[in-house]
């Protein structure tokens, strides 16, 4: 059926066949080429990190993958199977219904976590504004983990950030801390440590769906678990009372505990990409 093969003779049938074969082959090659190009482009953006998040999530210790409802006691021992995206969880609504009416103790262990904000497990917060934009910042524990950074690298205005992809990076003492984005959207303004927030984002969907972020009674339960996790990560460098039971947190943790392995502690706490 192909030129060059013994017994091949040109005919109308051969011409039609080869034309169709060429069109199919061209379509396949074009499709594969586009897929490779898109994949290559994605790996040069934070989209690649967002796509890799599910694999990264499975590598986290079980203590870091606890379901938000396990923390509140509604689903004891449950490990999250949706990489912290409760919007895709078929049981989230069921467990959330059990928590209706639960009173928030308000316990924040000496940390500042305003009720007007939603909180991400990677230690960022999100706050809504009347103009439909969202501001994103480091939560109080995140700020203390970072301490006095040497520099911050922000995405340019107009850049797109993807949930669990890279939001911004901070450098200190030769270490690079990578902060995950808590929401999908376009960066419309950048801030920094001196402004108390880092990104202003126009979310991809309106109204913004923040169902995967923590609020209310969940925040105190999660904070206790995070402080216990931090205590373990800092041992044996840490001394004094348990962080979740009255131990004071310095505003600059790396500065107050210089002998701790911060190149291990910060990536673990920030769920780094």
What is each PLM-predicted segment?
Residues 2-273:
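Contiguous, well-folded functional domains in the mature portion of proteins
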């Amino acid at each position: 059926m192909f030129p060059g093969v013994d017994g091949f003779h040109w005919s109308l049938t051969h011409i039609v066949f080869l034309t169709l074969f060429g069109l199919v082959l061209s379509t396949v090659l074009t499709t594969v080429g586009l897929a490779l190009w898109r994949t290559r482009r994605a790996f040069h953006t934070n989209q690649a990190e967002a796509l890799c998040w599910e694999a990264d999530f499975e590598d986290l210790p079980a203590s870091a993958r606890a379901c938000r409802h396990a923390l509140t006691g509604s689903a004891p021992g449950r490990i999250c199977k949706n990489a912290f995206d409760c919007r895709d969880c078929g049981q989230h609504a069921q467990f959330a219904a059990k928590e209706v009416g639960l009173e928030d103790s308000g316990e924040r262990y000496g940390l500042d976590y305003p009720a007007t904000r939603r909180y991400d497990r990677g230690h960022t917060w999100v706050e809504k504004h009347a103009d439909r934009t969202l501001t994103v910042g480091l939560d109080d524990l995140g700020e203390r983990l970072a301490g006095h950074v040497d520099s911050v690298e922000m995405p340019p205005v107009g850049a797109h950030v993807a949930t669990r992809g890279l939001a911004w990076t901070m450098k200190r003492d030769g270490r690079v801390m990578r902060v995950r984005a808590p929401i999908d959207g376009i960066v419309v303004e950048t801030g920094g440590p001196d402004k108390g927030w880092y990104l202003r984002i126009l979310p991809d969907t309106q109204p913004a769906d923040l169902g995967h972020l923590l609020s209310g009674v969940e925040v105190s339960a999660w904070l206790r678990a995070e402080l216990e996790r931090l205590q373990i990560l800092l041992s044996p460098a840490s001394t004094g009372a348990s962080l979740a039971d009255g131990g004071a947190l310095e505003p600059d943790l790396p500065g107050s505990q210089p002998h701790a392995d911060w190149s291990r502690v910060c990536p673990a706490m920030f769920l780094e990409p």
